[in-house]
């Protein structure tokens, strides 16, 4: 598993690059890894997805 700091760097870069669609992009990457049978890589993408959600903050209505 990649270091926590590296996961957060990737999450921040994805959030800056993809904005509102960053969470969906990370989830799509996780599903692609799962479909290939790469559970460890999928777990890292899920972790990145969670970090992006924290950066994004709560939804406002």
For the regions a protein language model found, what residue spans apply to each?
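Long, non-catalytic architectural segments outside compact domain cores
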Residues: 1-28, 32, 36, 40-43, ...
């Amino acid at each position: 598993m990649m270091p926590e700091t590296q996961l957060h760097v990737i999450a921040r870069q994805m959030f800056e690059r993809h904005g509102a669609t960053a969470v969906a992009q990370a989830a799509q990457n996780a599903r692609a890894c799962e479909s290939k049978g790469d559970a460890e890589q999928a777990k890292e993408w899920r972790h990145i997805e969670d970090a992006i959600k924290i950066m994004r903050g709560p939804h406002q209505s």
